[in-house]
Curated annotation (Swiss-Prot):
Entry-linked InterPro entries: Aldolase_TIM (IPR013785), DeoC/FbaB/LacD_aldolase (IPR002915), LacD_aldolase (IPR050552), Tag_1.6-dipho_adolase (IPR005927)
Reactions catalysed according to its record: D-tagatofuranose 1,6-bisphosphate = D-glyceraldehyde 3-phosphate + dihydroxyacetone phosphate
Source domain of life: Bacteria
This enzyme's EC code(s): 4.1.2.40
Signal peptide location: none
Protein name: Tagatose 1,6-diphosphate aldolase 2
Species, as recorded: Streptococcus pyogenes serotype M3 (strain ATCC BAA-595 / MGAS315)
Length: 327
């Protein structure tokens, strides 16, 4: 099935990609970034620190990315120093979730809308939802209605809607556990099926790889839960779960594991259309910035950060499929 895009959405999608492949840098982290910074200093990270680090990453790495994902809370200064060639996505959700309940309901930023995100110069709206396909029906209906609203907003503003799905299990506390690894493919692929329906108005899915590669033979250091063939089948099932373009998030794994995973995904038959890669690219700059200052962080980004993004781009050249084949 080929999906039809409006002229404006097509132009925006082209601005966000290079030759149909989305090689985007993700730096919309807020809560996670504050926690990373807090590991290296005793005082609470300041707004100025967060804005400065985001701006450094944007300035130094967007010349090598097709686009950058930022948040409107701390990322607007960074959006203004990005490469002229790089597109911009802005996150629409509040960071984090209420840990006292298993529902993880979504919430929009209070003073933002799809209209305002477009006015801020973004080519796309990105929204994150936590979803448990096997969770309570009442909660999941609330989440579906929420995404329908955002889809309608994005249609009205004629701006692409990138939906990020992070899966979880209401009964399993640790997503890194073997217990969750056993159900991850089901969680990821079934959630993709749900939100690929036309009623949600999603243009691109930003998703997890369907297997925790740390439990796959040939990738695992310890316990092996999956053969390579079982893992490959999960990627094939993922490809079959949607007609929409989909891109992978790096989920905080190392640059090397993420790159190896992309190669495995492509060899398995996943026709993914790029990545929104965050911590796997820039995480090392946080410690340097806090301990040695902005100039040292800039130097790290020009060397290690560049190496990470350059290696990733080379892998994408060999593995990713253009979204233009689907739209």
């Amino acid at each position: 099935m080929t999906i039809t895009l409006t002229e404006n959405k097509r132009k925006s999608m082209e601005k966000l990609s290079v030759d149909g492949v989305i090689s985007a840098l993700a730096f919309d982290q807020r809560g996670a970034l504050k926690r990373m910074m807090a590991q290296h200093q005793t005082k609470e990270p300041t707004v100025e620190q967060i804005e400065e680090l985001k701006s450094l990453v944007s300035e130094e790495l967007t010349p090598f990315a097709s686009s950058i994902l930022l948040d409107p809370e701390y990322g607007l200064p960074a959006s203004r120093v990005r490469s002229e060639e790089a597109g911009l996505l802005l996150a629409y959700e509040k960071t984090g979730y209420d840990a006292t309940t298993t529902s993880r309901l979504p919430d929009c930023l209070d003073v933002w809308s799809a209209k305002r995100i477009k006015e801020a110069g973004a080519e796309a709206v990105k929204f994150l939802i936590y979803y448990d396909i096997d969770g309570g029906q009442d909660v999941n209906e609330q989440k579906k209605a929420y995404i329908e609203r955002i889809g309608s907003e994005c249609r009205a503003e004629d701006i692409p809607f990138y939906l990020e799905i992070l899966t979880y299990d209401e009964k399993i506390a640790d997503n890194a556990s073997p217990e969750f690894a056993k159900v991850k493919a089901h969680k990821v692929n079934e959630a993709m099926k749900v939100f690929s329906k036309e009623r949600f108005g999603v243009d691109v899915l930003k998703v997890e790889v369907p297997v925790n590669m740390k439990f796959v033979e040939g990738f695992a250091d310890g316990e092996i839960l999956f053969t390579k063939e079982e893992a490959a089948q999960a990627f094939r099932d993922q490809e079959a779960s949607t007609d929409l373009p989909y891109i992978y998030l790096s989920a905080g794994v190392s640059a090397k594991l993420f790159q190896d995973t992309l190669v495995f995904a492509a060899e398995s038959g996943a026709k993914f259309n790029g990545v929104l890669c965050g911590r796997a690219t820039w995480a090392g700059s946080v410690k340097v910035y806090i301990e040695e200052g902005p100039q040292a962080a800039r130097e790290w980004l020009r060397t290690e950060g560049f190496k990470n993004i350059d290696e990733l781009n080379k892998v994408l050249d060999k593995t990713a499929s253009p979204w233009t084949e689907k739209m």
